[in-house]
Amino acid sequence: MAIHHLALAPCGFFTNAPPAAVQFAASHMHLIHLKRREVLGDGKQPFNGLGVVLQGNLQAVDLTLDGREAALLTATLHETFGHANLLAAQPVLLTWVAVSPSTSVAVMDSQAAQELMTFPEMALGAARLLAQDVCSFLGWQKIQAVHPVSARVCAWIQHASAADSSLR
């Protein structure tokens, strides 16, 4: 079932999009409601497409070598997720988990998302989001380089707050 184009209006990714692109996206997206800790998709294959958080929060998670979950990315209200894979030659598919009691997302499959990227404004928007992600990661790397102990401190903080973690 398609969503209404006005549901995408608050999303920054669609702010400067031409009406035809917004209509296309809305007509190819469907709404999914997730409970806390529920995985987006069928659970067998990681999500591969483009999505927008309409309510709640999602986290991309992976397992560490010792079997713990580690949050890689967080998508909050009105944020787009999955955009990096649309531009990558070798995408990294991520497992997205709802971290709010009630999370709603609008998603489209990879093929429709690739077609959406044929609109120049949408491809530029995805590139800008990706550039911001890279800058955020570089900033984090810079903090770790300047303060080598920070990686251990952050690991300790995560470990110490595990009982109160949003992933539990």
Specify the residue positions occupied by each region the protein language model found.
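His/acidic/aromatic-lined binding-pocket segments of jelly-roll/cupin-type domains
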Residues: 31-32, 41-42, 48-54, 71-73, ...
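Short, solvent-exposed loop/turn elements at beta->coil junctions and helix N-caps
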Residues: 37-42, 145
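Glycine- and acidic-residue-biased ligand/ion/polar-headgroup-sensing regions
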Residues: 37, 48-61, 77-78
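Cyclic-nucleotide recognition modules
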Residues: 71-135
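Cyclic nucleotide-binding regulatory module and flanking cytosolic helices
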Residues: 1-36, 80-81, 85-87
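Polybasic "coupling" helices that flank or enter modular domains
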Residues: 121-168
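Cytochrome P450 core scaffold surrounding the K-helix E-X-X-R motif
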Residues: 61-67
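Short loop/turn motifs at secondary-structure junctions and domain boundaries
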Residues: 23-24, 40-44
